[in-house]
Regions:
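A generic "binding-loop/recognition-motif" signal
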Residues: 58, 78, 94, 102-103
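A short, N-terminal "cap"/entry segment at the start of jelly-roll beta-barrel domains
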Residues: 1-46, 51-53
Length: 116
């Protein structure tokens, strides 16, 4: 593999829960194997949720709505993504949970890419 790659996010993320870049990819994945960031193509059917809170995560996160209606809960309040291009950013240590209100496609970017 050279210094560039072309693929399909749904296909490439099929065996990694949608994650297409990150430290967890084998180095044979070339440029997609990186400790700098993680990128996920998330397809979430209506009603899917992470009921348990994500706590203590030490990465910065960007969530970008491609389509759908997506709700994120924080201890300090809630945010809803409803319009294509709506996004949220939160810093390390921000606890959260989420729910797809409608069928939703989300791009998630986290940095740096850290083992759990």
């Amino acid at each position: 593999m050279g210094s560039w790659y072309s693929g399909n996010a749904a296909d490439d993320g099929a065996n990694t829960r949608g994650w297409i870049l990150g430290h967890f990819l084998d180095p044979s994945a070339g440029e997609r194997s990186t400790k700098d960031l993680e990128v996920k193509w998330g397809i979430h059917p209506a009603g899917e949720q992470r009921a348990e809170w994500v706590t203590g995560d030490q990465r910065t996160t960007l969530v970008l709505l491609v389509q759908g209606h997506f709700h994120v809960k924080f201890h300090e309040g809630d945010a809803t993504l409803t319009k294509q291009g709506d996004y949220l950013v939160w810093g390390p240590g921000t606890d959260h949970s989420w729910q797809a209100e409608d069928d939703s496609v989300i791009i998630t970017v986290r940095w740096p890419s850290l083992p759990h």
